[in-house]
């Protein structure tokens, strides 16, 4: 019987790569999307020989989270908390600073906690499971001048949750990992950091990064898949700096 993975935010960026990696490794994949504008049917149609199903989810709405938990055919073997808002994408939700701060905290941190609180007990009851949290190098590992406060706070909260769950579940069959990506070539990063720059300015930003390039979202997805293997158990509870060195040298962006 195929293992099941639930991936929140599976229609673009890192989440879309998670869908692809797990589908191609024989998992039954359940992914979430916020609206039909994300074209979830196209994601599903990409895998005619695999079981890939989309579920609508609003992480800011507890009723929506409860509805998702009830709609799942069973408890996932792997739960990947990937969905979230960024400092620019949050502008699609609300245009006030207060509303944006609230949305960032509620979607990125509180919604993730709500969903985890509904599904983790079932994993513990079963005696096995993998939980992967997506934070960010900004907030989860270090800080950058000018970084959106609420965005950074939400990512710091996810890193805290990962460490605490790692401690609480250390002697259970459920493993927990937190990944903190650096500058990754996703629509969210492009919107927050690159799209307002001209071509030369974009090249300058990328040239200032470790390894002189953006991280490919596939690299983060492959790391996540590794964590679900037996070899990944060694990293239970770890908050992984997956930034190619930006987390230990954040000043690179200021040069």
Task: Map each language-model feature to its residues.
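Short C-terminal tail/terminal secondary-structure segment
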Residues: 236-255
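Conserved glycine-rich Rossmann-like NAD(P)H-binding loop of the short-chain dehydrogenase/reductase
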Residues: 25-41
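Catalytic loop of short-chain dehydrogenase/reductase
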Residues: 85-86, 130-157, 162-171, 183
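Conserved glycine-rich cofactor-binding loop
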Residues: 11-12
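Conserved mid-core segment of classical short-chain dehydrogenase/reductases
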Residues: 84-102, 147, 190
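Alpha-helical segment proximal to the catalytic Tyr-Lys
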Residues: 121, 167-168, 233
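Short, small/polar-rich loop/turn modules that mediate ligand/substrate recognition or access, typified
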Residues: 170, 175, 235-237
């Amino acid at each position: 019987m195929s293992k099941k993975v639930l991936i929140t935010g599976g229609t673009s960026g890192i989440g879309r790569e998670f869908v692809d990696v797990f589908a191609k490794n024989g998992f039954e994949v359940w992914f979430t999307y916020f609206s039909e504008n994300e074209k979830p049917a196209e994601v599903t149609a990409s895998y005619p020989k695999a079981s890939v199903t989309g579920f609508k989810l609003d992480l800011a709405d507890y009723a929506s989270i409860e509805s998702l938990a009830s709609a799942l055919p069973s408890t996932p073997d792997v739960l990947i908390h990937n969905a979230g808002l960024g400092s620019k994408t949050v502008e699609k939700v609300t245009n006030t600073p207060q509303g944006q701060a609230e949305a960032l905290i509620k979607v990125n941190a509180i919604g993730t906690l709500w969903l985890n609180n509904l599904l983790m007990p079932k994993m513990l009851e079963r005696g096995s499971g993998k939980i992967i949290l997506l934070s960010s190098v900004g907030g989860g590992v270090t800080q950058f001048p000018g970084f959106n406060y609420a965005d950074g706070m939400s990512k710091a909260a996810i890193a805290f949750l990962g460490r605490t769950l790692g401690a609480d579940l250390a002697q259970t069959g459920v493993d927990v990992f937190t990944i903190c990506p650096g500058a990754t070539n996703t629509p969210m990063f492009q919107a927050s950091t690159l799209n307002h720059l001209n071509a030369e300015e974009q090249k300058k930003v990328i040239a200032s990064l470790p390894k002189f390039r953006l991280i490919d979202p596939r690299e983060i997805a492959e790391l996540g898949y590794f964590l679900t293997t037996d070899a990944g158990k060694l990293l239970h509870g770890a908050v992984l700096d997956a930034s190619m060195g930006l987390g230990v040298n954040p000043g690179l962006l200021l040069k």
